[in-house]
């Protein structure tokens, strides 16, 4: 029996570190240009332990008015390294099926992941605001985050995989109290996107 191997988009670590040397980087246009020719699809089971590359993860922060969507990951979530932590983004790996001649592959992967994980009743806008290159945890050393801000006019949404995520809308003051329990990327986004905008 032939089983398919999941392949995910990854960036060469040396290129990423050169263009995005900081934990959070605002130079998204420069980074996109520099990454051309330095990304490839690799079997996920191989790249999970390959520290010469980082898997590209679209990470979408949802905002409605003065509140942000906060998601606690349950122990049923597949990534055990993030169990019970609070996240501020939804997203996931970019697969080769996301390739399209009409759309940037990272944007296409972001839209697919967003549609798979969460649906808002109205059309929402998403803007790329930065790139995370953090090595705080083991999981961070093999992933880089493309951070998008989603602006919604309503707090109403439909979240898939409800057994894996506990969502709630939080103000900045409420997020400040939760910061010690946040996953590392959520802390980066909290300081460099949410608090930086106030």
Region locations from a protein language model:
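A short coil-to-beta-strand element that immediately follows conserved catalytic motifs
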Residues: 121-130
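Conserved Nudix-box catalytic region and its N-terminal flanking loop in Nudix hydrolases
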Residues: 67-112, 116
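Nudix hydrolase/Nudix homology domain
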Residues: 2-4, 11-12, 39-42, 84-97, ...
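Short, flexible beta-strand-to-coil junctions
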Residues: 11-16, 63-66, 152
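Extreme N-terminus nucleophile/cap motif
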Residues: 2-36
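Residue-level signal for secondary-structure boundary sites
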Residues: 19, 68, 154-158
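Acidic, metal-coordinating catalytic segment for phosphate/diphosphate chemistry
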Residues: 22-67, 73-77
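Conserved aromatic-histidine-acidic binding/catalytic patches
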Residues: 48-52, 98-102, 106, 136-140
